[in-house]
């Protein structure tokens, strides 16, 4: 096929094609020179007319020649009209040939721009190429511009108003931060100033978005203002409600009561510890857990009514005024446990005729460091003397009393706690007399403890005031 195509092609066209594909710098000049030569010669480079078409102009020319000869020989009017028609025919033939040459030149110029496959098709079927040339070609420049504008609008790169992307020094594109539309400074109403454009801190909104934002703000403010009076009215009765205020008023007395209750509990605990320690024979100072001068003062203060009770109970059981020695012994009461049953039996069986004589050891003097022990012993004496004996007239009341003491430890401890907790019992005048005759060391100790208690009370009152 390639060989047959080459035989059909014109050598001038092949030479022009070689110049077109050559990489030399002079190829363009040679191609232009070849084109000029082909135009001068009138040879067809691409399209060869068919023999029928060639014969038609020859026949027309041959007809015209005899007509011109005849016109020159015959000077008639009819013969004069023939040369005019022949001249018209000549002009038309020249015009046709000129049009054909123009079409051929345009084909030569357009073929290199097309790919090689199209070149082969154009060579094999030149009629189709001519038909394609006759079709109206659309304006590509206008199409490109419209498609670019549409693309810019779709991408949001052009102004919404004028639909253009042109940017000048005083007419730049500004983007709205809400709707993200672009506006030219001049297209937007009101116009955007250069300060707004150049300020990087500015968040710019278009006129439409600013209106919408103002409407939304007004709508939000109206419902927020309406429920405010109702909220105030709902709050006011809660503040005036007495049920709410009552617990607040009671809060302060509660705190005071809790403090006073704490003090009372401390006193009760100390008395209970002292009574239990008297039953178990262990000193209350080690069992109570209260250390320091406060615990020491509480114990000695409670020891005063114990002595008064002891004196009155011993006087009531015996029916005689107590002797000085017995009062001193019971008032001091720091002795050991074996000496207690003897003293109890003496006081219980004083009214009977038979008297049991039990040798009593002399009691040791009062020691300042063992005040807890003396208090426990005195409470023991009170509980034992306060218990009713089953047979007061019999001499064997000691054994029954001891059995009762073994079985009624709970009652004796309760009685001891009651005696120690009551601070309002007045001291017997006979007891005061016996105390005056007693040793001065005990009185001085009691006075010192009273002073210490007063100091403690004053300190506690100052703390409460603060």
From Swiss-Prot:
One Gene Ontology MF term: zinc ion binding
Zn finger (PHD-type) start-end: 156-212
SUPFAM superfamilies, per the entry: FYVE/PHD zinc finger
Pfam families named among the record's database cross-references: PHD
Compositionally skewed regions (Basic residues) per UniProt: 453-466
Gene Ontology CC: INTAC complex
UniProt keyword terms in alphabetical order: Metal-binding, Nucleus, Zinc, Zinc-finger
Gene3D superfamilies: Zinc/RING finger domain, C3HC4 (zinc finger)
Compositionally biased tracts (Basic and acidic residues): 85-101
UniProt record, GO biological process: RNA polymerase II transcription initiation surveillance
Region spans: Disordered: 41-101, 216-251, 311-466
Similarity annotation: Belongs to the Integrator subunit 12 family.
Role noted for this protein: Component of the integrator complex, a multiprotein complex that terminates RNA polymerase II (Pol II) transcription in the promoter-proximal region of genes.
Protein name, UniProt field: Integrator complex subunit 12
Source organism per UniProt: Xenopus tropicalis
Gene from which this protein is expressed: ints12
């Amino acid at each position: 096929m390639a060989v047959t195509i080459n035989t059909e092609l014109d050598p001038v066209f092949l030479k022009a094609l070689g110049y077109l594909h050559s990489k030399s710098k002079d190829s363009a000049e040679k191609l232009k020179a070849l084109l000029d030569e082909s135009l001068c010669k009138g040879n067809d480079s691409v399209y060869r007319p068919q023999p029928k078409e060639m014969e038609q102009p020859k026949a027309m020319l041959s007809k015209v020649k005899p007509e011109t000869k005849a016109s020159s020989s015959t000077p008639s009017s009819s013969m004069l009209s023939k040369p005019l028609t022949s001249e018209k025919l000549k002009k038309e033939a020249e015009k046709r040939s000129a049009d054909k040459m123009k079409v051929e030149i345009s084909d030569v110029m357009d073929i290199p721009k097309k790919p090689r496959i199209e070149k082969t098709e154009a060579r094999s079927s030149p009629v189709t190429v001519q038909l394609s040339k006759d079709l109206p070609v659309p304006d590509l420049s206008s199409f490109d511009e419209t498609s670019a504008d549409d693309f810019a609008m779709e991408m949001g790169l052009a102004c919404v108003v004028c639909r253009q992307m042109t940017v000048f020094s005083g007419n730049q594109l500004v983007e709205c931060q809400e709707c993200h539309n672009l506006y030219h400074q001049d297209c937007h109403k009101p116009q955007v100033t250069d300060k707004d454009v150049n300020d990087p801190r500015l968040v710019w909104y278009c006129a439409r978005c600013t209106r919408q934002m103002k409407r939304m703000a007004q709508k939000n403010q109206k419902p927020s203002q309406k429920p405010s009076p109702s909220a105030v009215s709902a709050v006011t009765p809660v503040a005036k409600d007495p049920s709410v205020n009552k617990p607040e008023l009671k809060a302060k007395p509660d705190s005071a009561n809790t403090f006073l209750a704490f003090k009372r509990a401390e006193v009760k605990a100390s008395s209970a510890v002292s009574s239990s320690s008297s039953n178990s024979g262990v000193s209350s100072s080690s069992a109570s857990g209260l250390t320091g001068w406060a615990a020491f003062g509480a114990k000695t203060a409670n020891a005063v009514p114990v002595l008064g009770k002891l004196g009155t109970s011993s006087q009531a059981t015996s029916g005689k005024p107590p002797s000085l020695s017995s009062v001193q012994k019971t008032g001091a009461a720091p002795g050991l446990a074996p000496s207690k049953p003897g003293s109890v039996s003496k006081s219980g069986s004083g009214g009977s005729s038979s008297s049991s004589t039990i040798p009593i050891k002399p009691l040791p003097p009062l020691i300042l460091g063992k005040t807890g022990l003396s208090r426990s012993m005195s409470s023991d004496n009170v509980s034992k003397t306060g218990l009713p004996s089953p047979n007061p007239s019999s001499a064997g009341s000691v054994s029954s009393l001891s059995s009762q003491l073994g079985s009624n430890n709970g009652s004796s401890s309760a009685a001891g706690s009651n005696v120690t907790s009551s601070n309002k019992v007045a001291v017997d005048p006979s007891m005061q007399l016996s105390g005056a005759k007693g040793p001065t060391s005990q009185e001085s100790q009691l006075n010192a403890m009273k002073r210490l208690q007063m100091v403690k009370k004053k300190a506690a009152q100052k703390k409460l005031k603060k």
